[in-house]
Every structure is written in structure tokens, then in C-alpha cells.
Amino acid sequence: MNTLDFDKRPEDTRIVVAMSGGVDSSVVAGILKREGYDVLGITLQLYDHGAAVHRAGSCCAGQDIDDARRVCETLGIPHYVLDYEARFRETVINPFAEAYAMGETPIPCVACNQTVKFADLLATAQELGADALATGHYIRSRPNPVSGQPGRRALYRPIDSDRDQSWFLFATTQEQIDYLRFPLGGLSKAETRALAEEMGLVVAKKADSQDICFVPQGKYTDIINKLKPNAALAGDIVHLDGRVLGRHDGIVHYTIGQRRGIGVATGEPLYVVHLDARGRRVIVGPREALETRRVYLRDMNWLGDGALAADAGQGFTCFAKVRSTRPPTEAVLHADENGIYVDLMTGEAGVAPGQACVLYSAPGPDARVYGGGFIDRSERSVDAEASLKALLEKPVAA
């Protein structure tokens, strides 16, 4: 077996590398080239507007495409650029705006992976005769002998917990996992940068992207207001107890768990606990009203060894992560007549519809990823649920 688990020599193994123009995917290409694989670099042009084109680290725009080209020249591998702007707008940007308009907090990186990178680009790699598509994500995959199927693989958290991207990859299907390779899963970010320096790559000191790639300067509201003007319509800021505390300029400016910048001063700390898109209301309350013990999931992607109904029918003990910045905590997954839901042993605050609940075998590095789903709704304390229900059933004043 070679280092990518193929039973043939590296030089007889063709690998397409998804190159964003950043240091991570560039080092992946360098590692595979150094190991003797037949490497092709492909960059997707996903958008081309305003400041994002000239902003280094924005991913898959003008400057980054040029950086990917220069890296491929240094490594001596072919580089291709594919125009996916229309596809990206249709499957990522438009749904992103629609979700915010409905009071959700979407994860565009997941949509991009599932509709562009791990669907369209993966299909292109197969058409080019590649044995695998490699990316610069910090996650691991290994053969899964328990499955009893040749070529079947499982996902695991990476060694570098600070760079763990497994939460964003929960929706990766089993067929995609079997075809993908993640060479950086066993490296730290510092080791990746050291390799980039050693290889003489122009991106060795390039800063990491911190924003949503298609949102210049982090101003996501500009895009949403352009595509979904109704999301910027004014409405009331309402306390859970029914008091109208003030006005807002659009629910798009708020997210569940937010405390700062709410726009009201009452002498008590208040948090956004619900966004009522239909009534154009931002509902606020005390921090204890945020504590969530159960989340209901939609679009579940189960990556366990058995069928979901069999594994979770009587409750499946695992660890759940409901926010990208939070560690996994003890949980139980259920799949029964009430739907698919996760009971959290420790209450979590700031759980928002549209975000993900991702399941693991353990809380630490190298834990297996069991998949997950998008959060459809959540249950809080009995008092908070009752207050919210009563408020939502109350007619909104014209």
C-alpha cells in the first residue's frame, strides 16, 4: 500500500488537489508531489466581485487563483482553473441569504463542500482519471475494516484540535469519504507552515482567511440585503415576558445568543433567544433562557457502522458539538417516532437553527466522526419554552 492506501506505486496513482491558493492546500500538493504521485492542481473560481477579488486569503478569487498558479509552477505540476461562479451563487450564496431571511444562521462552508467541492470538483477529478481528490482540510480518514467493504473509510478528528475542521465536514457522504484524502490530518498548522517554507512556496507566510470567503470585510449583511431586502425590514425587539423594548433594523443583524449590539438598554443583561422571521421580531431574554438540552435535526448524515434506526433506536451514546468553537460534550442520539434528536447532557447556550450538531466517539483528538445534521429547532427549559410559545402565538401588531 502507498501512503494514500492504494495498492500501487505513487507514480501510478493520480491525485487531484483542490487548491484554494492558501498554504494548506499548497502544502498538500507539495507533499504528494514529493512522495512521487501524479498530481494535478485545480482551483475553482467561485466569485468575482469588488474587494474580495483583490483581498489575499479570501479563497478562490483573483489573488488566490494567482497564488495557486505560482505554487503549481514551483512544484512543477499542471494547474487548471474552473469557472463555477454561477453554480456557487445558486447553491451557496442564494441559500445563505435565504436562511438568514428565515431567522437561521447558515454554514456556507458546508453547502460549498457538498454542492461544489465534494460534488462537482469530485466528479471532475473522476473524469480526469484520478484515484482520489485531496484537500487541505484538517481532518483524518482511515480504512474502516469493520464495514467489511473494500475501500470503505471512516473520518476522525485531526491531531491539531485548534485547526479541527470536522464540524464543517459532517455532511460528507460515505461515497465521498471513500474517494477523498486529507494529508494534513496528522500535522499541526505550525508543521504545515514549516513545510511550505522548506518547499519554497510563495504562500508560506500567507495569512489564513478569517471571514466567509465571499463576504468582503465580514459584512455579510450587505449581500443579504441585496438578495433578500425583506430581511432588513424593521420590527420590534420583544422580551420573553411580552414587553416591547425597542425597534430593530432587520433580523439579519442578529443571531441566537448575541448579547452585544442588541439596541436596548434595560439595566439587565439580555440575549437574543429567538428570531421570529414571520413577525419580524427579535426576542430577547436572560441567559438562562438560552440553555438548550435537546436539538432536533434535519438532513441527517449518519456515518456509523450500522443503520441509523438500529444504532440510535434505543439511544446512541456519543459526544456532540453544536457550535464550531465549542468542544464536544456528552450526548445521546435518538431516532424514533419523534424524529431525529440529540439530548445534551450539559446544557449549551447560543444554539441556533441552521447550525450543525456533529457527533463523535470521544471528546478529544482522533475521535471518530459519526456525522450529524442541521439544527432544525431546539428545546430549552420548560419556562423558557412556555414563554416563547405564548409569545409566538400572540398576534403581531400591524
From Swiss-Prot:
Catalyzes the 2-thiolation of uridine at the wobble position (U34) of tRNA, leading to the formation of s(2)U34. It catalyses: S-sulfanyl-L-cysteinyl-[protein] + uridine(34) in tRNA + AH2 + ATP = 2-thiouridine(34) in tRNA + L-cysteinyl-[protein] + A + AMP + diphosphate + H(+). SUPFAM superfamilies: Adenine nucleotide alpha hydrolases-like. Disulfide bonds join 112-213. This is tRNA-specific 2-thiouridylase MnmA. GO terms for cellular component: cytoplasm. Its EC number is 2.8.1.13. It is found in: Cytoplasm. It comes from Agrobacterium fabrum (strain C58 / ATCC 33970). The record marks 137, 355 as: Interaction with tRNA. NCBIfam families: PRK00143.1, trmU. Gene3D superfamilies: Adenine nucleotide alpha hydrolases-like domains, HUPs, Translation factors. It is an enzyme of class 2 (transferase). One of its GO terms (biological process) is tRNA wobble position uridine thiolation. The active site is at residues 112, 213. Residues 163-165 are annotated as: Interaction with tRNA. Keywords: ATP-binding, Cytoplasm, Disulfide bond, Nucleotide-binding, RNA-binding, Transferase, tRNA processing, tRNA-binding. ATP binds at residues 18-25, 44, 136. One of its GO terms (molecular function) is ATP binding. Belongs to the MnmA/TRMU family.
